[in-house]
C-alpha cells in the first residue's frame, strides 16, 4: 500500500514522501493514524541533537484505528478491525503503519487527543520498572 510518511534529516526540516508500506505480518496489525504525539526525541532528531539514520521514519507514540489484523491475532479477542489502539515504538509519522503484537494496546473509542500521551507514558513506565537495589 502506498501511503504518506514524514521524516527529518536532522537539519530542521520535515520531508513528506510516499512509502510502499509492507503488509502486516501474521502477528501484526495495520493502523490508520489518527494522532501521533511529538516526543522530546522527535524534536532532538529534527534539530540534529540526536543522530538519525537517513530517512528514518519518526513517531513512536501513535493512536489510530485498526484496519487489518494479522492471521495469528484474528479471533483471539486481542484486537479487531475498527478498534482504537495506542502504539509505541512504531514509525507513526505516517498515514498508515504496522504495529507488532506487544507494541499496541486497545483503548476506548473516546476523544483520542486525551489518551495518547498518558498511554504512551504508562507503557514506557511499565518497561522501565525499578528493580531491587536500584538507587532512586
Task: Give each language-model segment a name.
Residues 39:
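Short cysteine clusters
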Residues 20-36, 47-91:
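Glycine-rich beta-strand-centered segment in the early N-terminal region that forms part
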Residues 85-136:
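NAD(P)H dinucleotide-binding glycine-rich loop of Rossmann-like/cofactor-binding domains
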Amino acid at each position: 500500500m502506498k501511503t504518506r510518511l514524514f521524516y527529518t534529516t536532522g537539519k530542521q526540516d520535515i520531508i513528506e514522501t510516499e512509502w510502499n508500506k509492507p503488509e502486516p505480518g501474521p502477528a501484526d496489525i495495520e493502523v490508520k493514524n489518527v494522532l501521533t504525539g511529538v516526543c522530546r526525541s522527535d524534536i532532538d532528531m529534527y534539530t540534529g541533537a540526536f543522530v538519525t539514520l537517513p530517512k528514518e521514519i519518526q513517531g513512536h507514540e501513535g493512536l489510530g484505528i485498526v484496519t487489518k489484523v494479522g492471521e495469528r491475532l484474528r479471533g483471539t479477542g486481542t484486537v479487531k478491525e475498527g478498534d482504537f489502539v495506542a502504539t509505541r515504538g512504531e514509525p507513526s509519522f505516517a498515514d498508515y503503519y504496522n504495529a507488532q503484537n506487544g507494541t499496541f494496546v486497545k483503548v476506548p473509542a473516546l476523544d483520542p487527543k486525551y489518551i495518547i500521551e498518558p498511554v504512551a507514558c504508562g507503557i514506557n513506565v511499565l518497561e522501565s520498572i525499578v528493580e531491587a537495589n536500584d538507587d532512586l
